[in-house]
Amino acid sequence: MRVLVVLPFPPLVEGGAASRCAIGMLRGLAGHGVELQVLAAHLRNDMLEGPKGDLPDDLPIELAPVAHPRSKQTRWLRFAKPSSVLERTPFVQLVRERARDADVVHFVELSAATLIHLVDRPAVTQVHCLTRRDRAIGPPWTSEGRVAIELLRAERRIFKQSRWLLVNSREVADPLAKIAPHAHVTVAPLPLDPAIYTPRAPLDAPVAGLIGTAEWPPTANAIERLLKSVWPRVLERRPDARLLLAGFGMEREAFPHLPDLPGVEWRGTVPSATDFLRELGVLLYPLGRGSGAKIKVLEALALGVPIVTTPDGAEGIGSYDGLVVDTDDAALADATVALLADAQARQAAGAAAYDTFCNHHAPLPATIPLIELYEQMAATGIRRPTAA
């Protein structure tokens, strides 16, 4: 089977979370014998500047540098047709040409799926989350409200155009089936490439931590809950406990309304998310609201790091082995204290977490539902009417 995968970003080994998931998926598809062609857009303002990182050299990835539209045009597109920037670039013609040789086309994320109407092959849109579950929809005169409304409009437009939709959790699939009743919705676990996460975390240090992008609403609400409620309870039982916080924008100044607490170290942006996670003995992620599988949780599993989180934090995970999942802040704190205090318990939980990764989120098992979806799509023989 010939599959064209369209990415709106370069799948870099040390790129963002979406890049690492894309690599895991591509390795799984290749392992199942799929004849892959990968077309990745690299939107940039400076056309002389290459991607900041390395592409996997053993995967058939065609990187397409495209100039970012002018800021005035981008602002207009955000109003007129959100998430459609790639439609105003030469990437459009590349997608059309490469799709001619494919049995199935797989668009990753909304910003790529904006091109779904341009191909005449069975095509699937992959989405990781739903805006209404991730953030409050504020008034349009606020920046947060405008962003949320733009995302909702993009979702509505692209879901309407998609006959097949791919998600990573039942919690996203069920509401999506109501939003897009005409579409076939498939759930497949998110995979990661285990080679990126070797060696595993030693778990020697009794240190808790969390990594994420500070401005992303689910991360922001987890940090607020962590520092207002969970970490103070940990300190009551273990005054010498340490908490490491890292990620883009993860600076003390970004959260001026939160208390200063002992043992908290703000790392900010780190060179390698994987290396940061290897420092931890526990991933502590008290997420209150957020949809889809969380990459930081998957990465902790792949590294064999025990996880203490909520049901939303564990969404899309194939098994709870190696995780403590609870909604109560006191219970989350108790579980964290127990793991910090007992090296053997950390090792046992870490081994169980790694087994969960291998059984459910390694490339081959995680992509089995995707292979089945491709076969179903190809068997229909349906060709979409394309835009002129």
Named regions from a protein language model:
Residues 17, 344-374:
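A charged, aromatic-enriched C-terminal amphipathic alpha-helix characteristic of glycosyltransferases
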Residues 92-97, 131, 145-165:
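Membrane-proximal helix-turn-helix segments that form the acceptor-binding/catalytic region
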Residues 118-136:
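Active-site proximal beta-strand in glycosyltransferases
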Residues 171, 188-191:
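Carbohydrate-associated surface elements
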